[in-house]
Amino acid sequence: YLEHQQEESLSRINKREAELLVLQLQVYIENISKERVLEEQIDFGVISPYKAQVYYLRSLIKRNAFFKPFRKLITIHTVDGFQGQERDVILISLVRANEAGQIGFLSDLRRMNVAITRARMKLIIIGDASTLSHHPFYRKLYQYIQEKGKVIQLGDSTEQEQTETENNSI
């Protein structure tokens, strides 16, 4: 699940993480029921700090027939694109996954504050704990979520993990 840098734009992308996020979104919609999502107009936001990841996530959603009835309810943007907006459910793809523990502009905590405060009911964060734990903020966030029993380990060799926090349950 390692990240890659786009040559032409210098943006970062983690395709496996994006694919995992899309799968988690589909499972989440199935769990609360497609009918309920449509009837109650439950809206979803997908946030990533990197444009390359945003473009890839958009292409995955667009190509997946499952999401066709929900496309108007799903917004995918960078952190800056979500400023001032909220959604019922937010999924965040942090992208960074490398052995050096480099997190780039994820270290800008103002941006992270924007990302993690956009959810009205549920927040799901997908990221590589071993990379992110090099930074004190992410280490504390991970520990907090772990104490709440909301960390889901995916069990692959890079220890990529999905962390989930609930504001309210849907």
Predicted regions and their residues:
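Conserved RecA-like helicase motor-core motifs
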Residues: 45, 62-78
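Alpha-helical structural signal in soluble globular domains
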Residues: 56-67, 144
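A short beta-strand element within the Helicase C-terminal
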Residues: 77, 81-97, 113-114, 122-126
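Helicase C-terminal subdomain and adjacent C-terminal extension
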Residues: 61, 101-170
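Conserved helicase/translocase motor-coupling segment
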Residues: 1-59
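Amphipathic alpha-helical transducer elements in NTP-driven molecular machines
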Residues: 18-22, 54, 76, 89, ...
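Conserved nucleotide-binding/hydrolysis micro-motifs of P-loop NTPases
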Residues: 51-54, 82-83, 96-99, 129-133
